[in-house]
Amino acid sequence: DLGLGASLPSDLRPFKRLYDDLARRELLYLALLMHDVGKARRGKDHSVEGENMTRTFLERIGLPTKWVESVAFLVRQHLSMSHISQRRDLGDEEMIQEFAKQFRTGEDLRMLCLLTYADLSGVTNTAWSAWKGQLLWELFIKTFQVVSGSDQEEQDLAIPQVIGELEDRIPKDTVEAHLRSLPIRYAQTVRGN
């Protein structure tokens, strides 16, 4: 279960929800098994070598092409979310848009996020921290909004509906400012009670 058991610190709960929602966990498990296999070939980029070795192995055992592509992609990209979340400006929308282009599905993004978590948390006790988790989660959310087709236009359509549902209880300006500070998905999924 990737160390995401029942008694979980609050900073890991979002990752647990991602894991629980995966449609094909076995693809993540294969990526976890294969992600560092390219290290056996010294002197080369282990992510690229690992992708090639993974593709060859998974084709040989007869997995469907779609699955082979997903797992090979995860192996190739297994360092990218860690690198981007810790070394790039997550407020750079162009960078997020460019990063999002490589994902065919939201499922591939979810699996890459979980692979990144597992890879970092499995290295040493100090490789993972709540801060790194927050950065990784922020990158995931911003990228998922692009991959899933969420954009400013959708947020602009969702916010008035939420404001209308809350206008009796909370001033419009307060609700709007709060919703615009949250991920776009929040305004689309949460309704006033």
Residue ranges of each PLM-predicted region?
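Composition- and surface-driven signal marking solvent-exposed, interaction-prone regions
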Residues: 9-14, 43-52, 68-73, 86-87, ...
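Short leucine-rich amphipathic alpha-helices used at interfaces
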Residues: 10, 16, 38-39, 45-46, ...
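Short, well-ordered loop/turn and helix-capping segments at boundaries between secondary-structure elements
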Residues: 39, 43, 56-63, 77-85, ...
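Acidic/histidine-rich catalytic neighborhood
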Residues: 59-117
